[in-house]
UniProtKB/Swiss-Prot annotation:
Transmembrane segments annotated in the record for this chain: 39-58, 78-97, 116-137, 165-184, 212-231, 281-299, 306-325
Gene coding for it: Gnrhr
Superkingdom per UniProt: Eukaryota
Positions bearing carbohydrate: 4, 18, 102
Keywords noted in UniProt: Cell membrane, Disulfide bond, G-protein coupled receptor, Glycoprotein, Membrane, Receptor, Transducer, Transmembrane, Transmembrane helix
Parts of the chain on the Extracellular side: 1-38, 98-115, 185-211, 300-305
Topological category with respect to the lipid bilayer: Multi-pass membrane protein
Cell location: Cell membrane
GO terms for cellular component: plasma membrane
Family: Belongs to the G-protein coupled receptor 1 family.
Designated name of the protein: Gonadotropin-releasing hormone receptor
Reported tissue expression: Pituitary gland.
Length: 327
């Protein structure tokens, strides 16, 4: 997202904004060289992620057509289909929005699209994070409680539906907190317009609570669930192998079950690793900014852009991971 003009939240400023009165500010943001590089990389990753995820969906569709009529997709492929759709949604919404916003620097699309696109952006970020949680839970249950999973055919669909519903609901506040502000640049009648959350919260701690809630739902909670599920899978596989050492011969055809479980473990670990590597720099920078807004003046702009670009790698890596392990 383009760097916004810095504003201190005080009653006078908020009153001015609520009455659409321009505010006189200092130097306004412009598109710099590092910003142009960020835009170029963003659109390159957009093309890459779109191609990868669309290709996987196409392969999945062709694979489905070759199956016998009436035979359903496996649980894992259904989950991967929804994760791919979520990643594709994030790719088609977040990346073009970020790229275009950095090009224009300010917001020209009006308050309605300011609210709607901000909502869609967060919704498309929640969806893949929650779908990763569903996959981790499902794989953990499939290995630790296989009979319970097989006897409850609706469990998977219920978790998938819940992930989409929570994504829709949790992104809802974006429609309220985002709004337009208009600033005069101090050198004439030129007006700078931006889509921001400034003055949307009565108290500073309200915004802090919302930021940490979003951070927790997008990163901390999914990460903890993935780690716990992976630990349970490792523990279960280790216990099975200790009970029957012959199952260590995973390359033999008669040991398809433990080999499939090992593949499941590798895939879930790869998902968790990709999630951590891609999103940690993004959230480290975000948390730093929440506690110290002046950090943007101390951290070089190229480093700032570089950290944010890491998040766009995740929807590119995911189709490579599940394509390698599932097809």
């Amino acid at each position: 997202m383009a760097n916004n003009a810095s504003l201190e939240q005080d009653p006078n400023h908020c009153s001015a904004i609520n009455n659409s009165i321009p505010l006189i500010q200092g130097k306004l943001p412009t598109l710099t060289v590092s910003g142009k590089i960020r835009v170029t990389v963003t659109f390159f990753l957009f093309l890459l992620s779109t191609a990868f995820n669309a290709s996987f969906l196409l392969k999945l569709q062709k694979w489905t057509q070759k199956r016998k009529k009436g035979k359903k997709l496996s649980r894992m492929k259904v989950l991967l289909k929804h994760l791919t759709l979520a990643n594709l949604l994030e790719t088609l919404i977040v990346m073009p929005l970020d790229g275009m916003w950095n090009i224009t620097v300010q917001w020209y699309a009006g308050e309605f699209l300011c609210k709607v696109l901000s909502y869609l952006k967060l919704f498309s970020m929640y969806a893949p994070a929650f779908m990763m949680v569903v996959i981790s839970l499902d794989r953990s249950l499939a290995i630790t409680q296989p009979l319970a999973v097989q006897s409850n055919s609706k469990l998977e669909q219920s978790m998938i539906s819940l992930a989409w519903i929570l994504s829709i609901v949790f992104a809802g506040p974006q429609l309220y907190i985002f709004r337009m502000i208009y600033l005069a640049d101090g050198s004439g009648p030129t007006v700078f317009s931006q889509c921001v959350t400034h003055c949307s919260f009565p108290q500073w701690w309200h915004q802090a609570f919302y930021n940490f809630f979003t951070f927790g739902c997008l990163f901390i909670i999914p990460l903890l669930i993935m780690l716990i599920c992976n630990a349970k899978i490792i523990f279960a596989l280790t216990r099975v192998l200790h009970q029957d050492p012959r199952k260590l011969q995973l390359n033999q055809s008669k040991n398809n079950i433990p080999r499939a479980r090992l593949r499941t473990l590798k895939m879930t670990v790869a998902f968790a690793t990709s999630f951590v590597v891609c999103w940690t720099p993004y959230y480290v920078l975000g948390i730093w900014y929440w506690f110290d807004p002046e950090m943007l003046n101390r951290v070089s702009e190229p480093v700032n852009h570089f950290f944010f670009l890491f998040a766009f790698l995740n929807p590119c890596f995911d189709p490579l991971i599940y394509g390698y392990f599932s097809l």
